[in-house]
């Protein structure tokens, strides 16, 4: 067994909810750094590799503060034709984002990393491909009025488990990858390391 204590290095309530529903016992400790500044120190511009870099950076940051624990780091990158998009800060930005995504296919790269004692044990990214149907500006306004600021927590300004499903005509990929935590591969690793019952 690697560790008795499991820590999620993410303040995302959605990720914590997924782990709780899967029956995991864990603590939540957010990474203490400016994500955009750390991103600048990365050696890659590749969106999928960047998601791994950021997931690892978060896990390492928390792991160095809690060396005995096994730390889960996560990150999700929205990739539209190689361009990286981050979370928006306002409903106005959300409207602009949906106008950009309208009628196009983008990818969500969700990475998960495991660290202990500041050392990487595992990191991997998984991708989902999202085909957004053509959206009128009026529909986007009505959609945003209904979902309000909830969607500001989502890099794609949609929550696939709610009304966000109406934005798409096709989705290829795992549900958990879209939510931002590749749960099945993570559980396989946790069983392999005898952190959870297997």
From Swiss-Prot:
Catalytic residues (positions): 75
InterPro entries: ITPase-like_fam, Maf-like
Pfam families registered for this protein in UniProt: Maf
Main subcellular location: cytoplasm
Cofactor(s) named in the record: a divalent metal cation
Record key words, sorted: Cytoplasm, Hydrolase, Nucleotide metabolism
Biological processes annotated in GO: nucleotide metabolic process
Catalysed reaction equations from the record: N(7)-methyl-GTP + H2O = N(7)-methyl-GMP + diphosphate + H(+)
One MF annotation (Gene Ontology) recorded for this entry: nucleoside triphosphate diphosphatase activity
Annotated Gene3D superfamilies: 3.90.950.10
Domain of life: Bacteria
NCBIfam families with a match to the protein in the record: maf (TIGR00172)
Homology family: Belongs to the Maf family. YceF subfamily.
Name of this chain's protein: 7-methyl-GTP pyrophosphatase
Source species of the chain: Bartonella henselae (strain ATCC 49882 / DSM 28221 / CCUG 30454 / Houston 1) (Rochalimaea henselae)
